[in-house]
Structure formats: C-alpha cells, structure tokens
Regions:
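Bacterial N-terminal signal peptides that target proteins for export
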Residues: 2-12
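Mid-domain, small-residue-enriched loop/turn segments at the edges of structured enzyme/sensor domains
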Residues: 29, 54-56, 111-192, 199, ...
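Small-residue-rich helix-loop
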Residues: 68-70, 284-443
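Short, well-structured active-site flanking segments
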Residues: 93-110, 238-242, 347-351
Length: 443
C-alpha cells in the first residue's frame, strides 16, 4: 500500500515538473515593462498609451535591415526639432571640414571716414567682454574687431559713417510660418548674416538678468555695439545698412569656431534654432544655392537624395523644425539613422553630438522611473512644437543589437486627440521597450 502511494506521489511530482517546463506561463508577459524575454518581445502596450495621441513609429535592426516596428511609418507628420538631424546631414555633406564664418571690417578708399562691418553669417559673434560668459564656446568678439580696426586707422581720422552689410544671406529674415511670439519667447532670432549672441537681449549667462528673449533688429544692434567699442572717434557716426563698396579694403576680421566641430554639436545637443537656420543657409551657399529659406529647403532634400534616401514626399519649410508646416515620416528618419549607425558618408559623427538618454543635452532629464533602464543607451534628437513631440536616433539595446528608430506623438484635430508634455515620458517608455527587446522586438 505504501509502495503504491509512493509511486503515485512520484508520478504526480513528475507531471508538475513537466507542466512547469512546457507551460507558456513559465515565461514572463512579453509586453511586461520589466521583462527581457529573448523569444518574443513587444512595445505594443507602451505604444497604446493614450498620452501619445496619434502615434507614429518605425524601427529598423541596423545590422540585419529588418523592420521591427511600423506604425504609420510612411504617413507624413510635422517634424519639430527632429528635422535638425537632416540639417546636420546637409551641412556635413556640403560644408568644408575646416569652414569658419568670418566677420570683416573694411575701409573705403575714397571715403576715409567711412567703415564697413560685413557679416559672414556668424550668430556666435559676441558683444560680451572679459569676465562675461556667452552660451557659445570661445566666440569671436566685436571688441576685438574694433581694437584691430583702430590700429589700422590714422589716429586723427574721425569716423563719421559705418555701413552695416548683412547681404551674405538672402531673402526674408523671419520665416512666415513662425509665430511672432517665438522671438520674444527666445526660441529663435531674425536670421541676419550680421548679428551677435544670437541676438539675445542679455547674453551674459553669469548674471540674473540673462535672457533668451531676442531683439527686433540684430543688424542695428551690432552697429551700435561696434560704434561704442570704437570710442570717441565714432560717437556721432551714422549707421547705414548697405552693401560693401567694390573697392573696400579689409582692415580687420574675426572668425567663428569651426562649424563642424562646434556649431553642429551645439545645435544638436541643445536644439538651438538660430544655429540650425544659420547652418542651413551656409550649407545652401556651399552647395551653390541661394543662402535663404528656399535654398536651405532645397539643399536638405537634395542631400538626402544623394545619400540614397527618398525625400520626395517630404515638405521642408525651415532648418530648425519650428514651422508646423514641415512634413516628414518616421521611415525615412529611421533609414537615415541606419546610415549614421553604419558610419556611411561620415555621418557617424552625429552620434557624438546628439543627446544621450539621461545624460546630455535635451535628453539629460528624460528617461525617468522604469524608463531609466535605457539611460545611457539611447542617442537621439528630440523634437517639440505645440501639438507634437518626437524622438529619432539609435538604441544600443540590452542584447547588444542596434536599433534605428523614429517616433512621434501628435495631436489629431479630426478626432480631437491632443498631446501634452506627458507625451515625453510616454515616448521614453516606448523607446525603453525598444532597448529591452532589442533584436527580439516584434509588433
């Protein structure tokens, strides 16, 4: 009897062990936020968050080329600042590696009391002096221009007129798509080839009155500051906007930091809109196009075509992403990030400049809570305009795979769906799932 009971007990335990081994319940929920199941792993639950509004996503396994997620991947959406990745790519392909923007002072032979200050498209030129700090690294100074100019002039010669030449750029200085309040909010300045400190009202970041607010006339402001630094000899000098006479002679000049090593990194890390617009115009000029809004838009699309992408459907209205009329799709952005990850055409340098999750730039304070698992593993460009949040970049996933992605959370007027700042955290949850799932990500 005891033998029979013992045999039955062993048989029962064996059945339990086999059931535990074979049952699907032995695996964690593949869409659970805490799982890292290598067999089947999705971000579906995260992508269904209501705070994402109308959601777009496209994810590609960099090494295999497999498309892992496609949610409205080819449907057009406003871009916000994610478009700065396209601007950076155009700059990398068109602008010489050692290029620097130059601001010059010239004299006019038949008008000895006239000076010209000629802008070369340098928004980092600063009116600040020693002991004051710009948001830009090692900027050229207007004071240096004034000092070097005075050294070249006869000490008895008065300065009665200063010509302000901002003709290096063409066309409108304010994009008609931008709300006027973007200037007073400090989002962007007028895009003039002659300006200082991105035309911030108070550019010294070391004092409490530091302000991102931008001025109304950046060209005039440079003239006023230059005249002041020239001292008593120029006190009554007339400021006139005009072009440089053909016989003018350069007597002083200053140059920006290298555009590639300095400007592009600043633009992508801190999402500087003024920087993006200047860089876009320089890229257009380098490509033989007009350095204007239209030229910028053309150089971005033509560069993408040259890289083997298909930008025909895209609508590019500016270089910064402030226009709500820009239209991109997540598929092309993800395909571009594949090229970045694979170091094609020198694009790998973008990974040195794009923000890193939880560490740098506009992602420094992102990826909180459960999403913190992906901190340090996502390199991506953020985007925001009213009604839309975006993120596009590369995930270095937990399993060692690399995923190129682009996601957008947007409002939808047709259905009445809206999005708020909470969409940022929701996007972080989605991308954290990409990190957890890696090559096993499915939809």
């Amino acid at each position: 009897m005891r033998s029979k009971i013992w045999n039955n007990l062993i048989a029962g335990l064996t059945a339990l062990v086999l059931a535990a081994t074979l049952s699907p319940a032995a695996s964690a929920n593949p869409d659970d936020e805490t799982t890292n199941n290598p067999v089947s792993c999705t971000a579906n639950k995260a992508m269904e968050q209501k705070t994402l509004g109308k959601f777009h996503a496209y994810v590609i396994n960099v090494d295999t080329g497999e498309v892992l997620v496609d949610v409205r991947g080819t449907e057009l959406t406003p871009s916000a600042s994610v478009i700065k990745t396209l601007t950076a790519v155009a700059a990398l392909q068109k602008i010489p590696a050692d290029y620097r923007a130059t601001t010059q002072v010239l004299t006019v032979p038949n008008e000895p009391s006239t000076l010209v200050i000629k802008g070369g498209g340098d928004f980092t030129l600063t009116r600040l002096v020693a002991g004051e700090s710009s948001v830009y690294s090692k900027p050229p100074r207007i004071r240096t221009l004034a000092r070097d100019t005075l050294k070249q002039l006869s000490p008895e010669l008065p300065i009665t007129k200063i010509i302000l030449d901002d003709s290096f750029f063409r066309g409108e200085t304010w994009n008609p798509d931008w709300p006027r309040k973007y200037r007073t909010l400090g989002y962007v300045s007028h895009i003039t080839a002659l300006q200082s400190d991105g035309d911030r009202i108070q550019p010294n970041r070391l004092i409490s009155s530091y302000s991102f607010r931008r001025g109304k006339d950046p060209v005039q402001k440079v003239g006023e500051v230059f005249r002041e630094f020239l001292g008593e000899r120029a006190t009554g000098a007339e400021l006139v906007v005009g072009q440089t006479p053909s016989d003018a002679v350069v007597v002083a000049q200053v140059q920006s930091q290298g555009m590639r090593e300095n400007w592009l990194g600043h633009m992508l890390t801190f999402s500087d809109n003024t920087a993006a617009e200047f860089i876009g115009r320089h890229a257009a000029k380098a490509a033989g196009l007009e350095p204007s809004i239209a030229g910028t838009n053309r150089v971005i699309k033509s560069t993408l075509r040259e890289l083997g992408l298909r930008p025909k459907a895209l609508v590019i209205r500016d270089a910064s992403g402030l226009s709500d009329q820009n239209r991109v799709h997540s598929k092309l952005l993800a395909e571009l990030m594949v090229k970045v990850a694979k170091a094609e055409n020198g694009l790998e340098v973008l990974t040195n400049w794009m923000p890193i999750s939880g560490q740098t730039g506009t992602l420094r304070y992102r990826f909180q809570g459960k999403s913190a698992i992906a901190r340090g593993h996502v390199i991506a460009k953020t985007g925001y305009i009213p009604g839309l949040y975006g993120l596009s970049g590369i995930v270095n996933a937990a399993d060692g795979s690399r995923l190129a992605f682009a996601v957008f959370a947007r409002a939808d007027q047709e259905t009445g769906v809206s999005v708020t700042y909470t969409a940022q955290g929701a996007i972080d949850k989605v991308v954290a799932r990409f990190y957890v799932c890696g090559a096993s990500l499915t939809q």
